[in-house]
Amino acid sequence: MIEVLLFGIVLGLIPITLAGLFVTAYLQYRRGDQLDL
């Protein structure tokens, strides 16, 4: 049961981590565009 619980936690954290990285990269990209302008 512990393995299943850890597996569920990992599956839940992966999309959140990817979303966080995507948002961070997007904000830095927009910030770079604004600095260029």
From Swiss-Prot:
Keywords on record: Chloroplast, Electron transport, Membrane, Photosynthesis, Plastid, Thylakoid, Transmembrane, Transmembrane helix, Transport
Subcellular location: Plastid, Chloroplast thylakoid membrane
Pfam family, one: PetG
GO MF annotation terms: electron transporter, transferring electrons within cytochrome b6/f complex of photosystem II activity
Transmembrane segments: 5-25
GO biological process terms, semicolon-separated: cytochrome complex assembly; photosynthesis
Protein topology in the membrane: Single-pass membrane protein
Gene Ontology CC terms, in alphabetical order: chloroplast thylakoid membrane; cytochrome b6f complex
Main location: plastid
Assembly and interaction partners: The 4 large subunits of the cytochrome b6-f complex are cytochrome b6, subunit IV (17 kDa polypeptide, PetD), cytochrome f and the Rieske protein, while the 4 small subunits are PetG, PetL, PetM and PetN. The complex functions as a dimer.
Family: Belongs to the PetG family.
Role summary: Component of the cytochrome b6-f complex, which mediates electron transfer between photosystem II (PSII) and photosystem I (PSI), cyclic electron flow around PSI, and state transitions. PetG is required for either the stability or assembly of the cytochrome b6-f complex.
HAMAP family: Cytb6_f_PetG
NCBIfam families: PRK00665.1
Protein name as annotated: Cytochrome b6-f complex subunit 5
Organism field: Lemna minor (Common duckweed)
Recorded name of the encoding gene: petG
